[in-house]
């Protein structure tokens, strides 16, 4: 086997591989000899089929296998000896298309090599960790929100009209073209006005009603309504108002705390403080992570594989286009050309991605099975009732596993950077932290 370099420009590599016909022939014969004892053929005892007959029967198929194995072996040997790591799957093609048995096999292989990543010393990197304490006002606001979510309704004074946010208890019968329809009637139904739980326009017409009132509510079902026989049609709901109730927030006391699993109000306040500070810490981490990535980007410079940058730029352009055009699904749209800004961002992402991967590999960073399981279960919660199917899908899909593994790996490498860098704490207000987070989104 002969391997000749044909291209070596920057990260681009090209090689001509020649596999001698004699080598292929030897490997085919070896495979036939290995299989011969187990082969049965009409007119011959098991293991006694002559080699020429075996070659005629199976030679062509085995030659295809041998050629593929030889090319794969040549590639693997080349990468082991050269130390090159291809950025993407190498492009391999056979150049003698008129090949026939007895000819050498000529193959061209081209690829872009991953660059050598320089050592990075982050001990001199200065990072600022924003710290926000849970203030009493924030805890009180959270308590008020909990009390509001635990609200109850109590009857308004006799003759009082309903207001937006009130609950009305109604009997109703819905009709289309004068005929009642399935699912269009109920008794003693508690409807919160302003909840938008009914057909658009329904709840607004019940604002101002009183207990004992009878009112016809006329609405039009949306064109995209689930029941096709009702979609786009006008309906009249004859409603009888039985009660009008005003919302009453739960009192902030030990009883409220018990509703949310705490022993008393003090424990609930403590839990809220911990949750708030955990949220603040998560946001502060994102701010410090961006600062760390900015610092790393300034510390290193190396050539990037054009194919990786191009693929990343296209992905960025495609994602941003869909964010601006949320109504368009899939790829049914004109081709999206990346801009200079997309290319610049792609270069940063590829450079940092390669750097973090190298740092993690040298530090022997690993994503544990437990961490992967937690990540999968977190994603599975988005598909209630189908968690098991989602879990099985991930187990059988290596690409999806990598998509879940990558951010975990990256965060563990970032933790290494935090440990080695000079980190100082700065106590700030919740508002200042929010501004810092918003600044990340604007970049």
From Swiss-Prot:
CC annotations in GO: cytoplasm
Primary localisation category: cytoplasm
Keyword Cell cycle: yes
Reaction catalyzed: [protein]-peptidylproline (omega=180) = [protein]-peptidylproline (omega=0)
Intracellular or extracellular location(s): Cytoplasm
Recorded family membership: Belongs to the FKBP-type PPIase family. Tig subfamily.
Function text: Involved in protein export. Acts as a chaperone by maintaining the newly synthesized protein in an open conformation. Functions as a peptidyl-prolyl cis-trans isomerase.
Protein name as it appears in the record: Trigger factor
Organism listed in the record: Ruegeria sp. (strain TM1040)
């Amino acid at each position: 086997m002969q391997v000749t370099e044909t291209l070596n420009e920057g990260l681009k590599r090209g090689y001509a591989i020649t596999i001698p016909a004699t080598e292929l022939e030897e490997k085919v014969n070896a495979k036939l000899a290995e299989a011969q004892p187990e082969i049965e053929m009409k007119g011959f005892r098991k293991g006694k089929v002559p080699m020429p007959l075996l070659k005629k029967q199976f030679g062509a198929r085995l030659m295809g296998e041998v050629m593929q194995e030889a090319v794969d072996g040549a590639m693997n040997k080349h990468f082991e000896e050269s130390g090159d790591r291809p950025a993407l799957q190498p492009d391999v093609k056979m150049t003698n298309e008129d090949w026939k048995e007895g000819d050498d096999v000529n193959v061209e292989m081209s690829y872009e090599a991953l660059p050598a990543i320089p050592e990075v010393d982050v001990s001199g990197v200065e990072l600022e960790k924003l710290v926000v304490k849970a203030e009493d006002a924030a805890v009180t606001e959270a308590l008020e929100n909990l009390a509001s979510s635990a609200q109850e309704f109590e009857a308004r004074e006799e003759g009082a009209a309903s207001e937006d946010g009130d609950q009305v208890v109604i009997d109703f019968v819905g009709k289309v073209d004068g005929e009642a329809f399935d699912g269009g009637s109920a008794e003693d139904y508690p409807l919160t006005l302003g909840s938008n739980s009914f057909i658009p326009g329904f709840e607004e017409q019940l604002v101002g009603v009183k207990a004992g009132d009878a009112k016809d509510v006329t609405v039009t079902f949306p064109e995209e309504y689930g029941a096709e026989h009702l979609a786009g049609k006008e309906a009249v709901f004859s409603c009888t108002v039985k009660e009008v109730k005003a919302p009453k927030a739960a009192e902030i006391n030990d009883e409220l705390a018990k509703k949310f699993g705490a022993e008393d109000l003090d424990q609930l306040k403590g839990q809220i403080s911990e949750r708030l500070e955990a949220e603040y810490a998560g946001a502060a981490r994102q701010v410090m992570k961006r600062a760390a990535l900015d610092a790393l980007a300034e510390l290193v410079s190396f050539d990037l594989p054009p194919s990786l940058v191009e693929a990343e730029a296209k992905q960025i352009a495609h994602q941003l286009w869909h964010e601006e055009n949320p109504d368009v699904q899939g790829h049914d749209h004109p081709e999206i050309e990346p801009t200079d800004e997309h290319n610049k961002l792609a270069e940063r992402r590829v450079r940092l991605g390669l750097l973090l991967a190298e740092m993690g590999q040298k530090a022997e960073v690993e994503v544990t099975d437990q961490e992967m399981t937690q990540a999968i279960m977190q994603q599975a919660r988005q598909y209630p009732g189908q968690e098991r199917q989602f879990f099985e899908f991930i187990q059988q899909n290596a690409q999806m596993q990598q998509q879940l593994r990558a951010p975990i790996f990256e965060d563990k490498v970032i933790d290494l950077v935090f440990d080695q860098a000079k980190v100082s704490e700065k106590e700030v207000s919740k508002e200042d932290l929010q501004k810092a987070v918003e600044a990340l989104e604007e970049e």
